[in-house]
Amino acid sequence: MEHYFTKSPKSELKIKKIKAVLRSKEIEFYTASGLFSINKADKGSKLLINKCIIKDNWKVLDLGCGYGIIGLSILIANPSLKLTFSDINERAVQLTNKNLKLHNLNAEVIQSDCFKNIKDKFNTILLNPPQTAGKELCFRLIEDSKHHLEKEGILQLVARHNKGGKELSKKMKEVFNNIKETAKSAGYRLYISQNP
C-alpha cells in the first residue's frame, strides 16, 4: 500500500465527502485516496483541533495538512486567522484547495517537502506528524519548526504517547528547552513547546 507521505500518489483518485463535529460544529470535508485518515476524522487531529491554543489574527501553519481538516476547522472557528497549509503530497494540496472552496475560505496552500518551500514565520505551527514515515522525519519537522516560529511562537504537536509521542515530546524539550502536555484523549496527547 502506498504511503500518504509521498509527493505524487499513484493510487487511483477516489474523492468522497465526510462529516465531523469539530470545535462544536459539524463540518464537511472532501477526502481522497492516497491521503491520511480518509474515512473519518482521526482521534489525534480531533484532539489537536479541539484543544489547541489559537488567538485572533495569528499566523498559523497547518504542517502536513492532508486534506486540510486541522487548519480548516480552526479557520472556520476563527476567520481572523492568516492560515497557511502545507503538504508534500500534491493530492493533499488539491483537496485542501477544494475544501477551502467548499467553505468559501481563502488561505495559502503550499506543496512543500517539510519546510523547503515555506519562508514565513508563524505564531503557531499545528502538527499531527506522519509517524509512520519514520522518527527521523518527525524529528526534522520539530527541529525545523523552531526556525519558522516567531519569538514566543508555539509548536503544537499531537501524537499517541505510547506509540512514539513520548520520544517526540523529548525531542521538543531538547529543541525548545520547554514542553507542556496540555490535553489527552484516547491515548493521544497534545504537546506544546514555545520558541524563546
Go through each PLM region and give its residues.
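Conserved SAM/SAH cofactor-binding pocket of Class I
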Residues: 43-127
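Class I S-adenosylmethionine-dependent transferase superfamily signal
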Residues: 74, 144-145, 172
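Conserved class I S-adenosyl-L-methionine
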Residues: 160-177
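N-terminal auxiliary segments of SAM/dcSAM-dependent transferases
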Residues: 1-23, 33-34, 38
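Conserved beta-strand signature within the Rossmann-like core of class I S-adenosyl-L-methionine
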Residues: 152-160
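A short glycine-rich, Lys/Arg-flanked "PGG" loop and its adjoining helix->strand segment in the class I
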Residues: 139-151
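Core SAM-dependent methyltransferase catalytic element
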Residues: 184-196
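Short beta->alpha hinge that forms the Motif I/post-I loop of the SAM-binding pocket
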Residues: 87-90, 137, 160
